[in-house]
Amino acid sequence: MKKISFIFLLLICSFISFIGQSYAADDEVAGGVTQTTREDLQADSTFTIRSGGTLEADLNNIVRGYIAAGNEIDNATVIVESGGVIKGKSNAIMGRELSGLIVVNSGTIEATSSKAIQLQDAQGATITNKSGGIIFAKTNAIVQQEASGGEDATGTTINNAGTIYGVDNRAIYFYGGATNATVTNESGGILYNESTEATVQIDTNSTLVNSGTIDNRNSPSNAGIAIVGNDNTITLKDKSILVGTIDAGSTTGNTLKFQHGMGQGYYYKTSGDFTLQDLDGNQVVKGSAGSVGQGASETLDELLSYKSINLRNFFNEYKKLDNQDAWGETYVSNLKRDAHTNNLALEYDLTNFGVNLINKIDNANFVIAFEGGRQDFVKDHKIDYQNISAGIYLPQKDNPYFNLDLFILGGITLKDGERTILTNTTTSGKLTIDSDYETYEIHTGIKKNNLSSIPDFGLAASYSMTPSYDESKYFSWTDRDVGNLSVFFEDDYNLINSKDSKLFLGWTLDIRKMMGDKKQVYSIVTQELVPYS
């Protein structure tokens, strides 16, 4: 009986001891408290800096998960709440050789010397810097490398919605065989440095996604992103900003992806070899990565069609006026064109104002048309234009055999384009470029008028030629020829025909086929580049 009681008492004491140890493994610095001694992490534990709490001392490894080889701590968690501070000398958080380290920062993690977070030979670390969080060091802020003869340095994940920066070196620095890293800079996240070194450097088989800002504040001629290993993927998304070149050196198997949205122009200075992909379907070219977002041939085809229909409607209205020698009309229109991803048709709003004038001369009618307007594309791109066209209109309503209408007009459109592109060559990550060019147009058509219930029908053709021109920066365009051929059916019905008023109801069916150049050929700097099909 005494033996059983002794065993029972021993089990109770062991359980109490286990509970005490488990509870004691978690630690914190409370709000309003400043701790000036080093904090040694415990395995499977959480160390928390509460809001208003501070851990600060002129010490290396002020938060320590590694003391010596074989004496590292695994699966530890460090949480810094908003308003909390960790401030040390070098390696503010020492995560060397740790497995499963988690750091969640909403406050400040600072190293007055080198490395705010040291991840040498670490596996599976996760660093989350939340909005408002700051991680910085005088040299490199977050570092991982695989030391010679050390453990694998692999599987690190960094998610940044706050600010991470290095003053004299880099914000994020992976090298020496660090593999399988994932770096995600979210919208609102900022990664920057103030030196000639790369802002972010990744090594091998890693992924970098930027939806925020990566900024080399020393100069855009320095590297914003550097790659020192093979088989990496970089994705630049949304309205992300990159300042500094993309440098792949002599590495291989790297992919550079863009997802800025359909119609967004960009120009990124790169060095090294990349496979380029635009995930929105924009044309992208090799060399220094560029995409035009300038408006495809289909856009010109549509504008030609709108002009042709406008002229045909004008002639129909003129025919309804009996024995009118001279006549004119003004018009204002607004068109909203939705995007179409499959054929890269861009979304735009078209607002224009025009005047059509006609004057009878012997057996023909002289026509002159003026038009001005703005084509406002998505992604900060607009084109202002002014057009003048002139020609003849030949109605043959008195011809008993054919009763045909014919017209032909030619004109010129002066265009002033302005668009904002994303680029890593300026300190803002953006650049406004402009262009002045002209387009020459011809519109012609023939219509068979039917007096019975059979609808009128006809053929119309339009053609435009845009000579070669240069934008103010980076892009040079070769000449482009675009035309279309339309088969149309139309009719109108006179519902009211009194001395004082008339009311017509009409309809038009227009079937159009585009012809001419379907690809845009352009040059970046001095190297001619042809877009992918």
Positions of the model-derived regions?
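Basic side chains
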Residues: K2-K3, K448, R480, R512-K513
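Extended, low-hydrophobicity acidic Ser/Pro/Thr-rich
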Residues: W477-G483
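Long, low-complexity, polar and repeat-rich extracellular regions
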Residues: M1-E371, I383, A390
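Outer membrane beta-barrel translocator domains of Type V secretion systems
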Residues: T299-W477, F488, Y493-N497, D517, ...
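Intrinsically disordered, low-complexity segments enriched in Gly and acidic/Ser/Thr residues
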Residues: L495-Y532
